[in-house]
Amino acid sequence: MGEFYHELTLSPSSYLELFSDFLLEATGEGIEEEGNSIIVRSDQDLSWLIEALQEFCQTLSARVSEEVNFSHSLTWKRNEDWIERYRQSIQPIECAPFYVRPSWHPPKPDLIDLLIDPALAFGSGHHGTTNGCLACLGALELEGKRVLDVGCGSGILAIASAKKGAIVEMCDTDELAVGEALKNASLNQVIASKVWIGSVGDAEGEYDLIIANILAAILIMLSPWLKERLKPGARLILSGILGPYKEDVLRKFGGFTLEKELLCEEWVTLQLRKN
């Protein structure tokens, strides 16, 4: 980054995590969450984002049937090592029995260490959907189980499963995500038995557990393959579901028993068992 940079501070009225996801995907820049605000910094002019955010608000408002808006400020600042400030803003997260941390923080005794350095658009454990999935994984016996992480992103959920003794596979339709997941697996000294660019439709055989932390619409679209690839009695962890869409997702899994439902921020995580 040069001597000066552009900084956008955004304060949504609600759905902070959705705005964060949108900004990550739209800009490819690292973001910082500070209270109820999101900060984006870039060498490039960010003024174009305002119109894009207004369109995003309209779409989101229609989907959730409530008014969503935001306030913002856009400034041009002298570079004062914001990267170091960003690093300091990323704090470890304890989601027992897991401890998610960046490399510049030490591990915590007696917890399963998940070493994830935040990347541009891949989960580092700070998202409500990731927390929900980790909470489910933490309570399951996974030793020797065959586990698939669909839409793996950073690979954090596959890595967590492997550290509990599972034989893991992971996939993502984004080639960059697969590369990031492999890097994080290596960082954690974890080996995935199979990794591919694609989705559950490309999987082979049956699994004891499938984790899919994506979005409700995609979970619905993938439901035939998710059901097909699970052994009888196997479990399915689904997340990325906003509350209003929970029933739509559950209807696609009528032959499953709902074992657990968690709400973290605006996000629902479901743990199901195949009958």
Curated annotation (Swiss-Prot):
The keyword Cytoplasm applies. The keyword S-adenosyl-L-methionine applies. Its main location: cytoplasm. Its EC number is 2.1.1.-. It comes from the Bacteria. S-adenosyl-L-methionine binds at residues 130, 151, 172, 213. It catalyses: L-lysyl-[protein] + 3 S-adenosyl-L-methionine = N(6),N(6),N(6)-trimethyl-L-lysyl-[protein] + 3 S-adenosyl-L-homocysteine + 3 H(+). One of its GO terms (molecular function) is protein-lysine N-methyltransferase activity. InterPro entries: Ribosomal_L11_MeTrfase_PrmA, Ribosomal_PrmA_MeTrfase, SAM-dependent_MTases_sf. GO terms for biological process: methylation. Keywords: Cytoplasm, Methyltransferase, S-adenosyl-L-methionine, Transferase. Coiled coil: none annotated. It is found in: Cytoplasm. GO terms for cellular component: cytoplasm. Methylates ribosomal protein L11. Belongs to the methyltransferase superfamily. PrmA family. This is Ribosomal protein L11 methyltransferase. The gene is prmA.
